[in-house]
A protein has these predicted regions:
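Metal-dependent phosphodiesterase/phospholipase catalytic core, i.e.
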Residues: 1-79, 116, 172-176
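C-terminal active-site rim and adjoining tail of enzyme catalytic domains
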Residues: 3-8, 79-177
Length: 177
């Protein structure tokens, strides 16, 4: 491909996964489906990549709940997240957890999640405001386009003496419900 005077090749998923494994870089692999996919697409994908995904500790996510179910059927130990573009009702799923757009995240959802063993990732965390909201609600992971900024925000938040108070308050709230 060519853009702004630069030229490069698009890597295949095989090459990308191999390189990530060499670098010990864990991936969150998103499976996007369409009506044109074969009914066996996930079986083929998991047959080819499932073992490596598990061994190297990668995770998966999809907006398509059938993908989540297929991954769980293949191997319950591969973490797979169900993408929720909106927070309207609390879902009951077999997913490891949920990936949610941060602006729809609220305390009600997080509180309901405490009663499960599921985790919560939020996207796209690129500002102090989105970081603070996500951090104070206790999400398990943040998806960002600005890793350096979020690392700095995390260090600052953890150095804040109110951080330990926040953890204590969250633990107390947990036992009140």
């Amino acid at each position: 491909i060519h853009e702004n005077g630069y030229e490069t090749k698009i890597s295949s998923f095989d090459d990308y996964l191999t390189r990530a494994n060499e670098l010990h870089q864990k991936l969150l692999i998103e499976i996007k489906t369409s009506h044109k996919d074969s009914p066996q697409m996930m079986e083929y994908f998991l047959e080819k990549y499932g073992a490596k995904i598990k061994v190297y500790g990668h995770q998966m996510q999809s907006l398509d709940y059938k993908v989540v179910e297929k991954v769980r059927e293949y191997d319950i130990d591969i973490p797979v997240y169900f993408i929720l573009p909106y927070n309207s009702v609390f879902p009951r799923t077999v997913a490891t957890g949920y990936t949610m757009e941060y602006s729809t995240l609220d305390e009600y959802f997080v509180t309901k999640l405490w009663n499960t063993e599921q985790k919560l990732y939020v996207w796209t965390i690129n500002s102090s405001e989105s970081f603070n909201k996500s951090f104070h609600l206790g999400v398990d992971g943040m998806i960002t386009d600005d890793l350096e900024r979020i690392k700095e925000e995390l260090v600052t938040a953890q150095e804040d003496p109110e951080y330990s108070d926040l953890l204590l308050n969250k633990a107390t709230e947990f036992f009140v419900y």
